[in-house]
Amino acid sequence: MRKIIHVDMDCFFAAVEMRDNPALRDIPIAIGGSRERRGVISTANYPARKFGVRSAMPTGMALKLCPHLTLLPGRFDAYKEASNHIREIFSRYTSRIEPLSLDEAYLDVTDSVHCHGSATLIAQEIRQTIFNELQLTASAGVAPVKFLAKIASDMNKPNGQFVITPAEVPAFLQTLPLAKIPGVGKVSAAKLEAMGLRTCGDVQKCDLVILLKRFGKFGRILWERSQGIDERDVNSERLRKSVGVERTMAEDIHHWSECEAIIERLYPELERRLAKVKPDLLIARQGVKLKFDDFQQTTQEHVWPRLNKADLIATARKTWDERRGGRGVRLVGLHVTLLDPQMERQLVLGL
């Protein structure tokens, strides 16, 4: 049985700012773009979250909720330096590390001899070491598979951890809401609830064939997760090549104005996700995806050096006009392709 730890730093960007400037510790702060430039919030500290300020929220809305919010532009070199230090701490316990972004990672400690081989004690020690060396707090989840470790890391935030032992998995899954499973969004959750499926326990009683007919490939993933099955390895060679966000509509859309409104809502989340893996927002390409009512889909990309909403909207409009052919649209997606590390190095050297 594997021992997987998911470590997730607590409001990472904001925590670095509070550490380096103690005057910020007890006031609401957020990292994000200015209201004048229609920026979005990347992360907010816990005092700001009490006012409802959240990641991916437009800055203007955040300032309405919390007029005395201190807005910071971000110091991404400082965040990258802290992230590298955290990753070095991970490497003291295992070489099997899969970073997901600057502030979270999976660790496979199945074969680790540290702390007498106890994943629970390793997670505690890692969190304490991060605090001792960086004065930052982390939360952790421990479980026999990746998706449960990720869910567990959110159970006792901030500055806590939650353990799901192999023996506890069946009982934990029985009452686990399907919306907690990574990949189950609001639309999917609503469709599942309409089928009478609210928890993993409900899905365990459902015929796999029904899920496959209703959700396709995702139906199998959902069924497996509800059984506690997740065979994905912690991949230390993992190199993220793209970042995306998409929305499946409850009803097909037929007007460009509807599509544009969805893009406006998706863009802040794309920006937030990209900032977690690429704080400078430099990219190789960006593009859009449309899926039609006949389940055919099309994508269109442009070479573009930095995330740009106006270009994404223009690309989507061109795709809508040229490829829709009168069909309804059931899914809208935005994505970026990241720079190859070698190409990025050449760009930096050329500056």
Curated annotation (Swiss-Prot):
The record marks 13 as: Substrate discrimination. GO terms for cellular component: cytosol. InterPro entries: DNA/RNA_pol_sf (IPR043502), DNA_pol_Y-fam_lit_finger_sf (IPR036775), DNA_pol_Y-fam_little_finger (IPR017961), DNA_polymerase-Y (IPR050116), DNApol_IV (IPR022880), IMS_HHH_1 (IPR053848), Rev_trsase/Diguanyl_cyclase (IPR043128), UmuC (IPR001126). It catalyses: DNA(n) + a 2'-deoxyribonucleoside 5'-triphosphate = DNA(n+1) + diphosphate. It is found in: Cytoplasm. Its EC number is 2.7.7.7. It is an enzyme of class 2 (transferase). HAMAP family: DNApol_IV. PANTHER family: DNA POLYMERASE KAPPA, DNA REPAIR POLYMERASE UMUC / TRANSFERASE FAMILY MEMBER. NCBIfam families: PRK02406.1. This is DNA polymerase IV. It comes from Escherichia coli O6:H1 (strain CFT073 / ATCC 700928 / UPEC).
